[in-house]
Amino acid sequence: MHDNTYLPDHFLHHIAAIMPAHLSMDEFVASCRRPLRRSIRVNTLKISVSDFVMQMQPLGWQFDAVPWCETGFWLTRADESVPLGNTAEHLSGLFYIQEASSMLPVTALFASDQVKRDGMLLDAAAAPGSKTTQIAALMNNQGMLVANEYSSSRLKVLSANIQRCGVTNVGMTHFDAKVFGQWLPETFDAILLDAPCSGEGTVRKDEDALRNWSIESIDEIAAVQQGLLESAFHALKPGGVLVYSTCTLSQQENQAVCQSLLEKFGDALTLDSLADLFPNAEQACTPEGYLHVWPQIFDSEGFFVARLRKHHSVPNTMFKPGKLGKFPFSPLPAKEAEPMLREIEANFGVVPPGQLFGRNDEIWLFPHLFGQVQGKLRFDRIGIKLAETFKKGYRLTHEWALAYGDKATQGVVELDSANAREFMMGRDVWPEQEAGTGEMIVRYQGHTLGMGKWVGSRVKNALPRELVRDNNLFGA
């Protein structure tokens, strides 16, 4: 019980006025004071749900399915001596620690049969990356996903989570999301706008979330949200799907923002009902078809989700192409790219799909659809850094290993638990298998830990220093 959760009276009076008649304020307050259930989402870019559950159940992990996400589970662990975020499985990207309610927007987006999984998608407010990586998994790394984040302080964690989860089809940008309607009109097949909000639904994980709450601040945020939603609408192709979501409860930031867009653009868009999104979704569905998740309904965070469809174009007074600097990458000539890809296939049995671009001494793998937005948008990061070049060749990167190491059929060293512990502590290891030559992918239980290099019978550790852990990551 979080007895110190700050729930000011003026907030509770505000909530009481909008609480549906069939729900109880007493249950709402009690829910807000209860700790959140721990929840995770299995990363199917790395492992199937069934294989993950089978692998972790012997370690005392118990799974309770999240009804609106096939890959989501509430989790209890018999042994919590290793923090969940420091487990080897988490560092290898097999799962993402994600609040259950926050899995809803992406589920709503892909429940639409109109979403092209190999198309051009936008996550307009992406950090820390839970929904970006969820979208990429449902796209199976196909197409291209633009992941935008306005806050510069959150870009690093977004990038780290994208790399950890083996996501290869993302281009990261750093803009106020209002630019997408101006610079890229009718470009995206589907858009998620998980908008910045007052965070009223997050008190179960942040007892001070409402410390600065006021009606005035809600009205200010709602004005920002309306601008972001209108821009997203203009950036969406006719026939496309737009999901708007928040982790807040006030109607000013939710229904009213969507209603403003619906009224402004008339028959150019419609609202989908989400009453059938998952079993018992109707318990949280409004008469209009929005999902308004109160924390006491599903024992989760508070959340709001709306799904809109764009039917035809409208005049776009926002359009104003952005000013871009010189693009720092050049396509890698075929005489360089083809031998490199052949060598990677010969050494590891896997061919990374995409386009190779070079910058200084780096070789990057860009998504196939990158050409659709090249020259229209400035990116902080595109695809994955495949390798670093030297006078006598190249060295594959850790993120290449995380993205493709599980698919490799050769050039692999499988470690036992003792050697895996040593490897994750940044130490060289002496595996039992016969020594080879050159670089190899280092795995444990079939999943990639990183890269290494044979030096005699020793595997020289190439784990990035920031990922080295000085404790046991494998539990009892």
Curated annotation (Swiss-Prot):
Principal location: cytoplasm
Database matches in PROSITE patterns: NOL1_NOP2_SUN, SAM_MT_RSMB_NOP
EC assignment: 2.1.1.178
Any one Pfam family match given in the protein's UniProt record, by short name: Methyltranf_PUA
Compartments, record wording: Cytoplasm
Binding site for S-adenosyl-L-methionine: 125-131, 149, 176, 194
Keyword Membrane attributed: no
Any GO molecular function: rRNA (cytosine-C5-)-methyltransferase activity
Entry keyword annotation includes Transcription: no
A single BP term in Gene Ontology: rRNA base methylation
InterPro entries per record: Methyltr_RsmF_N (IPR031341), MeTrfase_RsmB-F_NOP2_cat (IPR049560), MeTrfase_RsmB-F_NOP2_dom (IPR001678), Nol1_Nop2_Fmu_2 (IPR027391), Nop2p (IPR011023), RCMT (IPR023267), rRNA_ssu_MeTfrase_F (IPR023545), RsmB/NOL1/NOP2-like_CS (IPR018314)
GO cellular component labels: cytoplasm
Catalytic activity: cytidine(1407) in 16S rRNA + S-adenosyl-L-methionine = 5-methylcytidine(1407) in 16S rRNA + S-adenosyl-L-homocysteine + H(+)
Active site annotation, chain numbering: 247
Keywords: Cytoplasm, Methyltransferase, RNA-binding, rRNA processing, S-adenosyl-L-methionine, Transferase
Family, per entry: Belongs to the class I-like SAM-binding methyltransferase superfamily. RsmB/NOP family.
Task of the protein: Specifically methylates the cytosine at position 1407 (m5C1407) of 16S rRNA.
NCBIfam families reported in the protein's UniProt record: nop2p, PRK11933.1
PANTHER family for the chain: 28S RRNA (CYTOSINE(4447)-C(5))-METHYLTRANSFERASE-RELATED (PTHR22807:SF30), NOP2 YEAST -RELATED NOL1/NOP2/FMU SUN DOMAIN-CONTAINING (PTHR22807)
Name this polypeptide is given: Ribosomal RNA small subunit methyltransferase F
Species, as recorded: Aeromonas salmonicida (strain A449)
